Amino acid sequence: DVDVASIPANLAATLFNKTKGAYKVACLNVLNVLYIVETGSAISKLTDLKGKTLYASGKGAVPEYTLSYLLSKNGMTLGEDVQVEWKSEHTECVAALAQDPEGIALLPQPFVTVAQSKNSQIRIALDLGAEWEAVNPQSKLIAGVTIISSKLISDSPDAVTALLSHYKDSVAFAVDHPDDAATLVGKYGIVPEPIAKVALPKCNITYIDGADMKSALSSYLGILAEANPQAVGGQVPGDDFYFGA
């Protein structure tokens, strides 16, 4: 019943496969938001995680897939060389970090900023987007995409074009005027305005469509699928997955 949604990139592929093409991806809207954070200075490279236990949320989802892949590319195995204490919510990771002065966590924005607001000693140790590009120079770590129902595309193409035009403008507004956007984020109860003001510029919000979208997303999904086919619903979708490309 949903015509348009913003969801994790791998979930878009899974949904496309499971619904036999009921939704197409229209644009990328968020690039990397995943970071390794700590209160100390023990972590400066991925191999420093060996023998450590991290707090994280997202088991069976992008955080786990990304961490597992990057560890494997650096000669380590998740669950053997690096342990994770999985939490059901990112907020639980923030709470655990607040109680553990030696804690290390895998967190997305804006929860990194939330954690830092509670403890100014928490620092970003690793940017997983940078780590991803270090082993895949031609690929980007993609967090989110916007999907549109194939039926809406077929029945109301002009409405879809108008929607995407307004959406592109909205993204530009959030990127160019983060303080104003943060006011709206606070107003609608997404996260408090002070957190949003700090976090928004760090969230890698973007609007990428057409051929650039297809190139970046197909590369990203291909890498995920090679490591774990179930991460993308069994297989990387074909050309008909991409709207306007």
What are these regions (language model features)?
Residues D1-E80, V84-W86, G103, Q109, ...:
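Short, glycine-/small- and polar/acidic-enriched structural segments
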Residues S218-A245:
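Conserved C-terminal helix/tail region of periplasmic/extracytoplasmic solute-binding proteins
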Residues A9-L11, T19, T91-V185:
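Pocket-lining segment of extracytoplasmic ligand-binding domains
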Residues L78-V82, G189-P201, A231-G238:
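Short, surface-exposed acidic
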Residues I153-A227:
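Secondary-structure end/capping motifs
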Residues T14, D48, A95-A96, V114, ...:
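Well-formed, non-transmembrane alpha-helical positions, independent of function
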Residues N32, K50, I142-G144, P237:
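Residues that flank catalytic or metal-binding motifs in active/ligand-binding sites
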Residues A5, N29, A56, G60-E64, ...:
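Solvent-exposed, acidic/flexible segments
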